[in-house]
């Protein structure tokens, strides 16, 4: 009999559901045929088909390959004329299964050649106001001639090779095609004028000081091999100045000749350090190798200032550096440099954290630069893999923020009196963390920056946020007076102004860097925030951190694509995140949710109006309706005051009987006893799918937060209904109480709605 009764109830409930749907169909217009527009559909159309080079799991495939380029270089710096001369031997190894007809070499300095087309692709018209240096550069000065002067391109036997230069790319013709597994050795001789990076901008160049001396930060200074891979073939897109680089790994042996009074460092190990350092400097360096708490000054400010007061040395000396398995090379040189260093323990190895800066950087740089480098190595190694190189250098260069293997340039300078604000201090620490962090992305996890800016900048910005928070915790004096490090990017609320902006000037993250509006927000802020939300709100730290580290370890010293990242994050976590990638990375949709209504219900044993309406519509006799638990809305025709505050089993005898018949006394004692039932309608004016985080505040002041996974939107992308049963009355409901989901309009996130303040009252305040 009990089974029959339950079966009838089930039939009745299904019938009622059908009845409700019929009513909805009458009210809603008929939907025409359409393609699958569900936001939870898989990314099969967007993703390429897995193959032997890149697997469906996101890992490198069984036949994954990458090319290799090894360099031997002799470089000479003419400090007086700020000119650079170079000669290199490149050994290029073809590990691909393809036969190569020619080689492509990158000539990035040609972006600064006199006939460069870079200025001609900007269409902004006349700017309403400009700095004097900018005005002079745009309208008064002749274009700076900073392009490569290619003197020779020779094979290993000294025979000239045919080559063709197209702006920033040079095609080199080989005597015969380069077969799979073979290598080709050739030489290039070149020189170029070094630019003033302070007045003329740029990632490389020199800063001129009032005393007549200069500090050089040198990169993109040599003809560099382009990448050839299974995705792009030759990545030979032109360098226009903003979108960065794609480079193969290799070994660098570089000899750099500079004035004898210069202090130099760069990518790789200094193999003749004993010849370059004084005995005092060498002793200080050896002391720094044993100092894990505080930096040790190797070249003091007094020593640097003394050299700066003297005429520059006419003698020259050659520094020798060697780097294995790096994708690029950068270096810095000046007679005005101060240097300090300390050791950092990472994965059982001692890594040197180094800072190099002119006296103008102090006291800020001696206080915080090397400590920021050390914290970066610890935080990034925890989130990805143990740092594999022997050092990481932070160089102070005015208005700079740029990265190369083991070395980077960073801004942040006190005023002439040595004073600085928190803004300058935190700006310096943040840029150091960011640029040192680039050792991991893209120097080791070697993505194609030219095509996908976000793959290094966005991932790096995310880990930067983690490292900044670690910095505040581990160096509390750095954030004195604050509760936490004031990260500019990472917190969800910080990206809201961008995502709520004019859609005409917002591009999807999955856009080529050169073609994006609001470059910083698009390639840095939004992907960094998306990953922070993914970690904290969608996946949880344990799942996210394992998957993120898996991606990093799979692709260290390799060339990943966006799909390799997306697939690995799902493969290592057992989470279907296609909805997240689509919304955050492939569209410009924004998140906007709101509470449209909240209705309070109580339990009754008496038939409610909804049942009566169905009985009438279906012509169902009363005798056929069993005892049911009815939900009565407060304020409705069915509502009676005596229903309030009572348990369901008190009001519905059939429910009490059911519980007695089907559960033991111990089981009944463990059951909840809700007295209040709430129907909460949540609407989604925004297009972006996100979890619903909802906080309930009860009459006694206690709170409860419930997170509904994003999948709650899978069948209705516009609105959903939540039910909440409680033993206590709810007095307040808030969506996204901690601002975790980048909701662009929080004015509709609270129930009861906050009273609007009149303009008159606002003026009174």
Residue ranges and their predicted role:
Residues 223-234, 240-433, 462, 474:
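Hydrophobic helix-coil surface modules that form long, contiguous segments used
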Residues 26-106:
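Early extracytoplasmic/domain-onset interaction patches
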Residues 20, 32-54, 69, 321, ...:
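Hydrophobic alpha-helical and helix-loop surface patches within well-folded domains
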Residues 115-130, 191-252, 273, 343, ...:
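Glycine/proline-rich low-complexity spacer/linker segments in large multi-domain proteins
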Residues 88-90, 94, 107-109, 182-196, ...:
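Short, hydrophobic/aromatic-enriched beta-strand segments in well-ordered soluble domains
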Residues 265-266, 577-578, 593-720, 726-736:
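Beta-strand-rich binding/interaction modules
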Residues 104-158, 261-262, 697-707, 725, ...:
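Solvent-exposed beta-hairpin/edge-strand motifs
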Residues 24-34, 74, 83, 93, ...:
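A surface-exposed beta-strand-loop module
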């Amino acid at each position: 009999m009990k089974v029959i009764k339950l079966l009838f109830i089930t039939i009745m409930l299904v019938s009622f559901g059908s009845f409700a749907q019929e009513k909805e169909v009458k009210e809603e217009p008929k939907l025409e045929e359409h393609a699958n527009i569900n936001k939870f559909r898989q990314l099969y159309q967007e993703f390429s088909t897995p193959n032997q080079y890149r697997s469906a799991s996101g890992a490198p495939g069984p036949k994954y390959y990458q090319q290799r380029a090894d360099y031997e270089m002799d470089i000479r710096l003419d400090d007086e004329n700020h000119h650079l001369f170079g000669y290199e031997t490149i050994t290029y190894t073809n590990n691909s299964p393809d036969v190569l007809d020619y080689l492509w070499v990158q000539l990035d300095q040609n972006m600064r050649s006199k006939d460069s087309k870079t200025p001609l692709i900007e269409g902004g018209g006349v700017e309403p106001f400009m700095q004097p240096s900018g005005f002079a550069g745009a309208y008064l000065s002749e274009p700076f001639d900073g392009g490569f002067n290619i003197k020779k391109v020779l094979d290993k036997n000294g025979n000239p090779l045919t080559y063709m230069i197209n702006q920033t790319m040079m095609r080199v013709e080989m005597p015969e095609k380069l077969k799979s597994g073979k290598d080709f050795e050739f030489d290039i001789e070149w020189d170029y004028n070094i630019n003033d990076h302070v007045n003329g901008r740029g990632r490389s160049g020199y800063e001129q000081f009032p005393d007549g001396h200069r500090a050089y930060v040198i990169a993109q200074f040599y003809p560099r091999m382009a990448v050839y891979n299974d995705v792009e073939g030759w990545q030979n897109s032109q360098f226009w100045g903003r979108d960065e680089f794609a480079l193969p790994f290799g070994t660098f042996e570089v000899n750099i000749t500079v004035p004898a009074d210069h202090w130099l460092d760069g990518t790789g190990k200094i193999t003749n350090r004993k010849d370059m350092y004084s005995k005092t400097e060498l002793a200080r360096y050896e002391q720094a190798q044993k100092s894990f708490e505080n930096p040790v000054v190797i070249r003091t400010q007094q020593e640097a200032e003394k050299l700066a007061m003297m005429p520059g040395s006419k003698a020259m000396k050659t520094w020798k550096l060697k780097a294995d398995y790096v994708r690029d090379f950068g270096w810095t040189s000046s007679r005005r440099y101060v240097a300090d260093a300390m050791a950092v323990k990472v994965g059982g190895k001692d890594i040197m954290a180094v800072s190099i800066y002119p006296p103008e950087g102090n006291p800020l740089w001696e206080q915080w630069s090397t400590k920021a480098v050390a914290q970066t190595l610890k935080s990034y190694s925890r989130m990805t893999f143990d740092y594999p190189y022997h050092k990481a250098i932070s160089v102070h260069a005015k208005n700079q923020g740029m990265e190369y293997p083991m070395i980077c340039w960073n801004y942040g300078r006190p005023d002439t009196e040595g004073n600085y604000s928190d803004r300058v201090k935190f700006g310096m620490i943040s840029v150091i963390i960011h640029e040192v962090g680039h050792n991991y992305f893209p120097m080791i996890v070697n993505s194609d920056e030219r095509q996908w800016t976000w793959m290094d900048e966005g991932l790096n910005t995310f880990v930067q946020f983690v490292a900044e928070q670690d910095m505040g915790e581990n160096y509390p004096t750095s954030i004195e007076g604050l509760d936490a490090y004031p990260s500019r990017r990472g917190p969800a609320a910080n990206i809201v102004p961008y995502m709520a902006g004019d859609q005409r000037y917002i591009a999807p993250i999955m856009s080529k860097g050169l073609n994006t509006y609001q470059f910083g927000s698009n390639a840095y802020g939004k992907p960094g925030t998306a990953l922070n939300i993914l970690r904290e709100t969608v996946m949880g730290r344990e799942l996210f951190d394992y998957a993120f580290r898996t991606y990093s370890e799979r692709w260290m010293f390799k060339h990943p694509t966006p799909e390799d990242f997306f697939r690995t994050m799902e493969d290592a976590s057992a989470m279907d995140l296609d909805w997240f990638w689509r919304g955050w990375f492939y569209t410009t949709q924004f998140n906007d949710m709101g509470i449209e209504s909240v209705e309070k219900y109580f339990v009754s044993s008496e038939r409610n109006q909804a049942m009566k309406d169905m009985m009438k519509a279906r012509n169902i006799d009363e005798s056929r309706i069993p005892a049911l638990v009815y939900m009565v809305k407060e304020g409705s025709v069915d509502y009676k005051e005596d229903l309030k505050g009572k348990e369901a089993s008190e009001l519905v005898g059939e429910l009490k009987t059911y519980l007695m018949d089907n559960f033991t006394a111990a089981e009944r004692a463990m059951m909840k006893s809700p007295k209040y039932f709430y129907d909460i309608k949540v609407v989604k004016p925004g297009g972006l799918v996100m979890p619903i985080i909802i906080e309930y505040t009860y009459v006694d002041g206690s709170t409860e937060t419930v997170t509904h996974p994003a999948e709650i939107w899978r069948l209705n992308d516009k609105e959903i209904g939540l039910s909440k049963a409680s033993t206590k009355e709810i007095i307040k409901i808030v969506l996204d109480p901690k601002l975790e989901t980048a909701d662009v309009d929080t004015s509709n996130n609270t129930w009861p709605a906050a009273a609007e303040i009149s303009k008159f009252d606002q003026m009174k305040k």
